[in-house]
Design a protein with these regions (language model features):
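Extended intrinsically disordered or low-complexity regions, especially N/C-terminal cytosolic tails and loops
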Residues: 2, 10, 15-265, 277-358
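Acidic/aromatic/glycine-rich contiguous surface patches that form carbohydrate-binding/processing clefts
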Residues: 273
Length: 358
């Protein structure tokens, strides 16, 4: 019988684990079963509340037995699954500079739905390679746009909030909505400042020893975009946050907060060279808002897909740099790769007819 401690170790949110007798497990030639789950009203409720006829399933652990393959073996394995190659030598040269596991993320787009490792007819390795390079170029475009928005937001937060609350407002807990988050943010600020190799930070500490952090115009220049986002969102002065939002041509600060959170998530994906083109994002931006600038119809827009975030980036690019070519670069890239499935990125039909994109 599983102990109480073992039951607590079962993954949360998957139902309540039923006990299994050891004799049942030992009867298996290669026992892999961890526990059985039954659908319940809540993962914390006892099994007697399980819905009769509800879903139940096995949660299993298995030993990892796959062995590394050389490049020729990888190609042979892919061919056995139905993948085609225009040039195997070129494929090997690409695998030598891009790991197979990274390319495999793009190969999934050409697999039969519901079947692992079974490729659709007439699927070529080179199609996935094109997707990889498209995604790489797209990440570069998006990263550049996020950078300019990050710098602008950093400047506006430093200027507006410090004029209202002083040079060390980020150390004042009275200006925080969530006090626990305030403590976490301040701890992280001090770590990032102390870790910084910037000359102006080192020169500051050579001259001053109090307070234990530099003023906001120095400190926020060396903190991460994620931390800047947390500071802004946790700021209790909504009046100054609304002022910053309006300077960015947004109607209110909640809209700006939602957009910035999305930018942080996207930036982190890009920084780790992760696939972005067809990703579903955990943060979604507010889209159904009345904006003064050119915007989009949000009726058929999926807010958790990349298109929604690209529109937010494009809107703010027009506010910050009126002569920017971000939208043109996006359109040029899509024309360069006409086989990319725009639906997987969240692009609606006739998206180019939207006021934002004209």
């Amino acid at each position: 019988m599983r102990t109480a401690a073992e039951r607590k170790d079962c993954p949360k949110g998957r139902g309540y684990p039923l006990d299994l007798h050891e004799k049942n497990l030992s009867s298996l030639h290669n026992p892999k079963i961890l526990c059985i789950f039954a659908a319940t009203d809540s993962a914390t409720l006892p099994i007697r509340t399980a819905n009769q006829g509800g879903t139940s399933f096995l949660y299993t652990f298995m030993n990892y037995t796959k062995q590394p393959l050389d490049y020729h073996q990888i190609i042979a394995q892919l061919k056995s699954r139905g993948l085609l190659f225009h040039n195997e030598d070129v494929a090997i040269s690409q695998l030598q500079i891009i790991s197979y596991f990274r390319i495999a993320n793009y190969l999934k787009s050409f697999e039969v739905v519901g079947f692992n490792h079974v490729f659709l007819p007439n699927s070529y390795f080179e199609y996935a390679l094109d997707l990889y390079y498209f995604d790489k170029k797209l990440r570069n475009l998006l990263f550049s746009a996020i950078q300019s928005i990050e710098v602008a937001l950093r400047s506006k937060v430093i200027h507006n909030v410090s004029l209202r609350h002083g040079a060390f407002w980020f150390t004042d807990i009275r200006l925080a909505t969530n006090h626990a988050m305030f403590q976490d943010n301040l701890t992280q600020i001090k770590k990032e400042v102390r870790r910084s190799k910037e000359e102006f930070i080192q020169e500051h500490f050579e001259k001053y020893d109090s307070p234990d952090v530099p003023p906001v115009w120095k400190t926020l220049e060396v903190t991460s975009f994620g931390l800047l986002s947390k500071l802004f969102c946790n700021l209790s002065d909504n009046k100054v946050k609304k002022q910053i939002a309006r300077e960015l041509n947004l109607p209110q600060h909640l809209c700006l907060e939602s957009w910035v959170k999305c930018f942080v998530v996207l930036r982190n994906c890009i920084a780790h060279h992760a696939r972005v083109w067809n990703r579903r994002f955990p943060q979604i931006p507010q889209l159904n808002v009345n904006l003064r600038g050119k915007w989009i119809s949000t009726t058929h827009v999926r807010p958790n897909k990349l298109y929604a975030i690209i529109c937010c980036l494009a809107y703010l690019q027009d506010v910050i740099h009126s002569n920017n070519d971000f939208k043109q670069q996006i359109q040029n890239l899509l024309e360069q790769y006409p086989n990319v499935n725009l639906h997987h990125m969240g692009f609606p039909r006739n998206w180019q007819d939207e006021p934002l994109w004209k």
